[in-house]
Design a protein with these regions (language model features):
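Conserved beta-strand/short-helix segments
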Residues: 2-205
């Protein structure tokens, strides 16, 4: 009797396993990646070009935006490897050329960013993450999680992290975003860790 019961339970468990696998497979959505006709873009050596990648569409033009968080920037040549974001046109670009985007931050390694904020851009890793608003004419978010506030450098170096909000045209004035900075506030949970905003990013609206 026990053997029959054990055999019945094993059969039931096997049927449940098959049903579970079937249900799991039935909800999986797949898509094809064209391995025979890839579009390949390249960037500077040792720049981590491709660390983050984002598709962007504006004014009937398709772009691939690429983060290279260890790149030297042609717009910030005085800053030590701040990182860069490149734009690569998908069509009408037979040479597969990518150009660095000017985020409008100038050529100074240090920048004033508030009443008690002095930003240090060396090795900030701009382009570590990229995000886009999920709508037509969506803006772009490009972040540098290793950006530091050194205003209190005798006591604290505060790795707040920095993001640039880029217009959908990929040109013109960008908007600075430093979520973890507040005037006259020396700590932002640094006794437990570092904020480093921008290691990932998303638009909620």
């Amino acid at each position: 009797m026990r053997k029959r019961m054990a055999h019945f339970l094993n059969q039931k468990r096997s049927l449940l396993d098959v049903l579970y696998v079937y249900l799991s497979v039935s909800v999986v959505h797949s898509y094809n990646i064209d391995l025979e006709h890839p579009i390949v873009f390249g960037g500077p050596d040792s720049s981590f070009f491709g660390y983050s990648v984002l598709e962007h569409y504006h004014d009937n033009t398709r772009w691939v935006l690429v983060g290279a968080p260890k790149a030297n920037s042609s717009y910030s040549s005085s800053v030590h490897t701040p990182g860069a974001v490149f734009k690569c046109r998908v069509h009408s670009n037979p040479e597969r050329r990518c150009t660095e985007m000017d985020l409008g931050r100038g050529n100074k390694p240090r920048e004033s960013c508030g009443k008690t904020c002095q930003g240090d851009r060396d090795d900030e890793w701009m382009g570590v993450s990229l995000a886009r608003q999920d709508k037509s004419n969506g803006k772009i978010l490009a972040c540098a999680h290793r950006w530091k506030n050194v205003y209190y450098d005798s006591e604290h170096i505060l790795p707040h992290g920095y993001c640039s909000i880029i217009p959908p045209t990929l040109q013109g004035r960008t908007q600075a975003l430093i979520p973890c900075y507040e005037d006259y506030k020396q700590k932002y949970g640094e006794e437990h860790g570092s904020c480093q905003a921008g290691i990932a990013g998303v638009f909620t609206e």
